[in-house]
């Protein structure tokens, strides 16, 4: 029996960015085996193949003044085709959108929901060989509980609430300062491990199939 294939499509935390140190210096990238998609692969073993597609700065939508390649939709059309056929897709986007002052919570939710609609349409085309596959699961966007990001709290809460009402959404387990790098956005090593464990649990319990 062939293992299932899961595409993980997201931003810098999917890519494995260490973020910035307390002095603002970029800390580069975690080793491959320390990045949560690859930790998840280790936990799942031969049952699934994980396809990691992360990009620093990626957004769910497109914004004026941003580099076109950072808009997630065009990249997703390519990534889904490259990974197909897939058993499912995990979308880990939204925080970069929330930091954009021009982006309303409503628009971000609509942009995130696009990924599910596009995947369903892609899976429905018999030429793509996905049969009844095409489930999309979202990781609820979250950031560290630090004061400098307090203005984003209401927007992120709105996004999470709306996604949960319409789509399978896996709770982000990172609720502690130690789960994040000093910049409060990127995951620490502990954070990468905790996210991988949460996604693994969701898959094994049937929340994500």
Regions inferred by a protein language model and the residue ranges of each:
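Alpha-helical cap/lid subdomain in secreted, periplasmic
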Residues: 2, 34, 38, 46, ...
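Serine-esterase "nucleophile elbow" of acetyl-processing enzymes
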Residues: 1-54
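N-terminal beta-loop-helix "entrance" segment that forms/cooperates
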Residues: 56-66
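Acidic carboxylate-rich catalytic motifs and surrounding loops in phosphoryl-/glycosyl-chemistry enzymes
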Residues: 52-58, 171-175
